Design a protein with these regions (language model features):
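Short active-site neighborhood of thiol/selenol oxidoreductases, capturing the structured segment around
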Residues: 64-87, 93
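A short beta-strand-turn-helix
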Residues: 45-48, 53-74
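N-terminal targeting signals for export/organelle localization
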Residues: 1-53, 193-201
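Active-site-proximal beta-strand/loop segments in catalytic clefts of secreted hydrolases
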Residues: 78-80, 110-113, 135-136, 171-173
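Structural microenvironment flanking redox-active thiols in thiol-disulfide oxidoreductases
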Residues: 87-127, 137-145
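Thiol/disulfide oxidoreductase modules built on the thioredoxin-like
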Residues: 121-129, 135-195, 199-201
Length: 201
């Protein structure tokens, strides 16, 4: 008998979690925060808190805020140039922005480099097609609900639904396969409806 693929297993778990079949912060995986085995925590629609008011100055020196993307599904990724897993996942995040941008998905980075030049070099090396806040002190991280994600390690990623609510988070690196599954479920939710309206096929 053919074994289900990793993508199929993750898709089923994500859909169940986002549809409200699990607890507000139930871990779908319990491995260490590694690029290959991230820890994903989902939030039931009815239990989702407002997303933090991430805002500040981008690496390009321009104002940038999460509030400017209300009505879109936003992937907020915390990274630094010295972080190996951050380098590993950057191409996947870039592809997701280009692939799903016209469907209402936006990727927004939060960079933790002390030196702005290092962050800009990383941005150039990977030709990132999305903006990042420069947050050398990590103050943006403290805006997240306690226990949602491990803010002491990088990378981590949080997902914001169209209503501006926190839908889930990943501690550790995330793959394009994982992003497709999570975002596919969120894109099928109605803005402000508080429920997943379809399951992924």
């Amino acid at each position: 008998m053919k074994r289900p693929s990793r993508a199929a297993i993750l898709t089923a778990a994500v859909v169940a979690a986002l549809a409200g079949c699990t607890g507000p912060e139930e871990p779908l995986r319990t491995h260490q925060s590694l690029p290959e085995q991230p820890l994903f925590r989902s939030m039931r629609p009815a239990d989702r808190p407002d997303a933090p008011a991430f805002s500040g100055t981008s690496l390009a020196g321009k104002p940038l805020s999460l509030a400017g993307h209300r009505g879109e599904v936003v992937v907020v990724n915390a990274w630094a140039s010295w972080c190996g897993p951050c380098r590993a996942e950057a191409p996947a995040l870039n592809r997701i922005q280009r692939k799903l941008g016209d469907r209402g998905v936006r990727v927004m980075g939060i960079n933790n480099d002390t030196e702005l030049g290092d962050a800009r070099a990383f941005e150039g090396d990977y030709d990132l097609g999305y903006p990042s806040l420069h947050d050398p002190s990590g103050k943006q991280f403290f805006k997240l609900p306690k226990g949602l994600v491990n803010t002491q390690g990088l990378p981590f990623t949080v997902f914001v639904d169209r209503a501006g609510k926190l839908a889930g988070a990943v501690s550790g690196g995330v793959s394009e396969e994982d992003l497709d599954a999570i975002l596919g479920a969120l894109l099928k939710e109605k803005a402000g409806a508080g429920q997943a309206v379809e399951a992924l096929g």
